[in-house]
Amino acid sequence: MKTIRYYVSVAVMFTRLSIQSRLEYPFMLIGHVLANCIQWVVGFAAIKFVVDQFGSIGGWGYESLAFLYGMSVLSHGLAVVFFIQTWFMGYQVIEGEFDRYLLRPMNLVFQFLFDDFNLIGFTDIIPGLMVFVYGCIKVRLTLNLANVLLILCTLAGGTLIRGAVWMFCGSMSFWTKSTANFTDMVGELFERVSMYPITIYPRWAQALFTFLLPLAWITFWPVRGMLEPGVSVIPVPLAVVALAVGLLMFAGSCGIFRMGMRKYESAGS
């Protein structure tokens, strides 16, 4: 119990310091809010335009797409808040910045994850929440306890899946000793799979994103389970499955991170 309290106090301290450092530049924060709102609203408007022209996307109407899109942007924002440090692991490996983690008598994964609480990620959450609430109204989703729990499971699972993929890509730097950044490529893949129904893709791609590279569990399957409760052939809500997938993927990526730390050679070696 004493150890848990210690780690919680350290996490709170790290978070407070990260927030204070971000608030030193308030105009930058305001700029991010405006830019991200414009970015996501324009993206959503593009979906509305396509639906108006063709009637649906992958069999999904405008109302369902609004709900799916909002859920995707929310999980993206949460992932950026908690896991943005994974984007820069290559530079940290090359510059020897992991030395400080090794010198502290604390869990390495804990230190890395709580070292940077990205307040700017909330600038993605704001427009995501707006679109999500709009989508909830459009699909007439009843916000009872069961649906709230399903939404929370979906967001937690989607956030963990995104963080797991980012951490896996970043951990490759321990072996490649390269600053190559796959963030843009992975982000594009996330957008294509989580913001649109995977029914727009061929069956082999749907199977790929469901079983081998389970990005469809970020939003598509849990959202479909909420909008079409009878679609699942398993007795467990799809949102709960999404959370389980996220936990398994994140645990696996943490294991790869630990393996990579054994290969870490500091700077100049």
Residue ranges and their predicted role:
Residues 1-269:
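Hydrophobic transmembrane alpha-helices and immediately adjacent juxtamembrane helices
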